[in-house]
Amino acid sequence: MDRNTLNKALTYISDQHISAAAKRKRRHSHWITVTAAATAAAILLLVMVQTTLPKPTFSVAANTARIAPSPRNIAFPLQADYETEDAFQYARENHLSLQAERRLQKEYALNGLAAFFAEGSALFLTGEENALWSPVSAYMSLASLAELSSGRSQRQILKLLGVNNTNTLRKQVSSIFESAYADKGKDVSKLATSLWLQEGISYQDDKIDALVKDYYTSVYSGILGSTETQQAITDWVNTNTGDLLSDYPPDQLTTDAVFALYSTVYFQSQWKDDFDAKFNFSDIFHSPAGDRDVTYMRNSARMTYCRGDNFGAVYLPLENGSYMWFILPDENTTAQDVLRSGQYMDMVLSQNWEDQQTVIAHLTIPKFDVAEKKSLKDGLMQLGVTDIFSADKANFSALRSELPAFAGSIQQASRVQIDEAGVTGASYTEIIYMGSTPPSDTPEPIDFILDRPFLFVVEKDNIPLFTGVVNEP
């Protein structure tokens, strides 16, 4: 467990934990599903700009070419599984080495991605309505695209992702994917990517191999634009997003498509500490469009309160090892002001934010369900990725020599919702207190009331899975 995770765990101690310990009475709790699920799909479509490549003369319904492997599970070895002490110690040292390498590559990746995540959020989360995007889904799509491109097209993407070459990118993508991935029954954080190739066109096998091995990408082939293949793509997206985006289906492909790339995130987890529905109440939320009545949830807990130049923030722990940040702009400061500064993203990515203190926070959080489908094209062009959108400049020769293709569109559909599921949860008191004792002094209480536009970030191991602005819960 890294220092940041340990600090988060030790500082999140609810009053209910203290009360329960004093009474020595077990209780059952309701639990919240964060995102009765949260999900996102980034869709990258590249279309032919010439008709010189051979057209397929037969129809197939998306034949499977390659299926991505399961993420590496670097589980701690059990001594009972080894015949000798030396064999166990060797396995243990290998485990620690692999964990350290993954952690190092992830930190390198996040250092390089900080600007993209912050600047992308400022570009994609605009307007007075609710806004949402998935930084990690966009990252996985762009990283895969870098592997398939060449020349200046590739250099522009690599620069945006903060790396110099695809060898480094492969290591970092694997570490991001594996760090963000969790599958604990009802508590999940799953990433998936698929590449759909046009039947009848040959492609570079080494690039396909790299996508499968290092990017955890499944590769399919079919008649792009056909009813059968379109249905297969829709089924794949729905399966990997828990059917949460069924109202935002993938765009219909046309027969001149060369390949299509889809990257998804599916997230579902329960709070470590519950919000009891009996404490819900209705009150005013000060939306840019005018005051409106919304349903609020309430809870009080001992946790870390972070300060930025123009915002305050708290984070709540989740059962799958993730955290959800709630970022409240100061009075007379807008969500856009916070987004433009980018400091909040530094805080989310930080291993140890300097301006923080342990407080008793009386939380008041509105229930919300935010969903959006948007184009990422204009924002990516502002961030310096331009050639892939030009029929004259796009270079995808890494996938196939002299492949006459360009990016026709990049769309992303996302949804995040938080509410009470009313399901009984497990005890969490021992986990929170493990390895530490509560402070002797009672912290000063604060009221953290999200009754005006605010930001949120859902992160796993400091990797921002979802970033959004709630203007109208």
What are these regions, as identified by a protein language model?
Residues 156-161, 279:
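Short, surface-exposed beta-strand/strand-loop-strand elements in extracellular ectodomains
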Residues 251-252, 443-450:
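Exposed beta-sheet edge/beta-hairpin loop segments within beta-rich domains
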Residues 14-18, 145-150, 199-203, 269:
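Short alpha-helix boundary/capping elements
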Residues 1-4, 16-66:
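Membrane-interface helical sensory segment of bacterial ECF anti-sigma factor regulators
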Residues 60-80, 86, 128, 135-138, ...:
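Non-catalytic, conformational "gating/processing" segments within enzyme and secreted inhibitor domains
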Residues 448, 452-473:
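C-terminal or internal capping secondary-structure element at the end of a domain, subdomain, or sheet
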